[in-house]
Amino acid sequence: DVERSRGLGDVYKRQGLHTMNNNINNAQKAEIIAHALPHIQKYRKKTVVVKYGGNAMINDELKEAVMRDLVLLTTVGIKVVLVHGGGPAINKTLEKMQIESKFENGLRVTDKDTVDVVQMVLAGKVNKDLVCQIGNMGGHAIGLSGMDGNMMKCEALDDCHGFVGEIKEVNTEVIEEVLNHNFIPVISTIGYDEKGNCYNINADTAAAAIAGALKAEALVSMTDIVGLLRDKDDDSTLIHKVYISDTPALIAEGIISGGMIPKIDSMTQALREGVKKAFIIDGRVPHSILMELLTDEGMGTMFRSR
């Protein structure tokens, strides 16, 4: 791997790619594409699982940029699996239905009424909107939930969170079938148990479990932060590369804390199950996934086993 060491300012200079187009000539554009070739070859015919959430789902321009990027990746032969959340859309619908949203340790407390809304919004609204948008970009996608094809079998996480699921088994057959037909599987994080009960699953947990089961080349988590920071108030302290053996020390130092702990725990488990690399990137930056996967420098934090 090329050493991931450069100033974060370089990344944010590239944030406005739509404005840069006015300032570079065709030869420079061609050179940018040519520089991506080794990275395209590295990931071609390999599987990349993308966890999609945060502000990139709310902002229409960012959403369009993400879907366009995913279509580009599939066009050059990379197998993309999109796993999405939908917290803001769920909150909005619950508010309309006058159902109170409650959270415990960063997870939504999900009673029977709430899980019905979660299923309706994630599988019926958010999922289909993403499939439609990919289609409008010239791509091909199929919307799935963790209940389809016996994909994600769960049991209740604990007694406190209600119908929040802990994944016990991932069946990748339907995902692989969709990928083999050059479609993007767009997966909403709804699972089920042996009794047929429906469960809400944390999107980070689901994406990591799916990536591990697929033995994916990479797991990419799009977030509302630039990556893992030594000082959470200073973006210039971005840590570019982390080995999973280092994570206990980073937790002890408080560098990994709060809601970042379960996210990185999930990534660590995926790496142990055979995923080659995992990334946390800033979904607020247009084309961040292309910058991470198709440039020498990357832009977020990369996690590896060794």
Predicted regions and their residues:
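Single conserved hydrophobic/aromatic residue that forms the stacking wall/gate
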Residues: D1-Q15
